UniProtKB/Swiss-Prot annotation:
Keywords per UniProt: Isoprene biosynthesis, Lyase, Metal-binding
Protein name (database record): 2-C-methyl-D-erythritol 2,4-cyclodiphosphate synthase
Phylogenetic lineage: Bacteria, Pseudomonadati, Pseudomonadota, Gammaproteobacteria, Enterobacterales
Catalytic reaction(s) noted: 4-CDP-2-C-methyl-D-erythritol 2-phosphate = 2-C-methyl-D-erythritol 2,4-cyclic diphosphate + CMP
Keyword presence, Lyase: yes
Organism encoding this protein: Salmonella arizonae (strain ATCC BAA-731 / CDC346-86 / RSK2980)
PANTHER family per UniProt: 2-C-METHYL-D-ERYTHRITOL 2,4-CYCLODIPHOSPHATE SYNTHASE, CHLOROPLASTIC
Role description: Involved in the biosynthesis of isopentenyl diphosphate (IPP) and dimethylallyl diphosphate (DMAPP), two major building blocks of isoprenoid compounds. Catalyzes the conversion of 4-diphosphocytidyl-2-C-methyl-D-erythritol 2-phosphate (CDP-ME2P) to 2-C-methyl-D-erythritol 2,4-cyclodiphosphate (ME-CPP) with a corresponding release of cytidine 5-monophosphate (CMP).
Record's subunit section: Homotrimer.
GO molecular function term, any single one: metal ion binding
Family listed: Belongs to the IspF family.
Length: 159
């Protein structure tokens, strides 16, 4: 078994909506990013790549490459997952923690889980997404942006 950890953060800027976990969430502010700014899928992609020792999302999809300007993070996740499967790994489970003072994530979590399960070709039981705040402390608590952490467990497929 192999475990990977991912982290991502984006500052608020511009106009909403925002995209988190593949879900378009109405909000007055947007997130500043080269791609669509989906902190949940970026952290998850990093966790998966880390578990497979394939580097990170910035190595695979550099923000210096104009091809990834405004990229759909679901497509990036699916491409990373294809590469991980090509190395002979299968998914154990993933766990994603979104850290944001606002907007509220709870109403959107079921759809996030559906999208992640679809993108990874796994059961919903293998995908957990949760959200919390920092009780108004720090960068996220002041409403300056959104942070996300994720862990992923991979196993070698039976031959």
């Amino acid at each position: 078994m192999r475990i990977g950890h991912g982290f991502d953060v984006h500052a608020f800027g511009g106009e909403g909506p925002i995209i988190i976990g593949g879900v378009r969430i109405p909000y007055e502010k947007g997130l500043l990013a080269h791609s669509d700014g989906d902190v949940a899928l970026h952290a998850l992609t990093d966790a998966l790549l880390g578990a497979a020792a394939l580097g990170d999302i910035g190595k695979l999809f550099p923000d210096t490459d104009p091809a990834f300007k405004g990229a759909d993070s679901r497509e990036l996740l699916r491409e990373a997952w294809r590469r991980i499967q090509a190395k002979g790994y299968i998914l154990g489970n993933v766990d994603v923690t979104i850290i944001a003072q606002a907007p509220k994530m709870l109403p959107h979590i079921p759809q996030m889980r559906v999208f992640i399960a679809e993108d990874l070709g796994c059961h919903m039981d293998d995908v957990n997404v949760k959200a919390t705040t920092t009780e108004k402390l720090g960068f996220t608590g002041r409403g300056e942006g959104i942070t996300c952490e994720a862990v992923a467990l991979l196993m070698k497929a039976a031959k």
